[in-house]
Amino acid sequence: MTLGGLLKHLAWLEELDFQHRLAGQPLSAPFDQLDVERDWEDWPWRTAVDDAPDALRALWVDTVHRSRETLTAALARSGLEQTLPDGMSLRRLLADLIEEYARHTGHADLLREQVDGVTGEAAPQDFWVP
């Protein structure tokens, strides 16, 4: 597990949940490179080693921006109780994504502390918050 792998994994979940599952859109680059049935679980972890840190952060930021736009439109249209094509409610999708971020921010905190001793008590001053 790497910080880059975590970022790409979270970007992948944003793309899958908001663009694909909620909006019904085809996967965008680079997510369109994978076979969802075969690769969905390990693809971000396996391929992140080939990506520059700035590219991974840019991918996550861009994906989060698109997710927020999609979510805003969906909430305006039908609220939290709307049902996605797979039967899940939007409320449940958001709860699952919050849980996923909570788990992985804990992982990131542990990885970061092992690298330089810094803990997740405070984000850097220049850290972008969605």
Regions found by a protein language model. Name each.
Residues 1-41, 82-130:
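Short, contiguous alpha-helical
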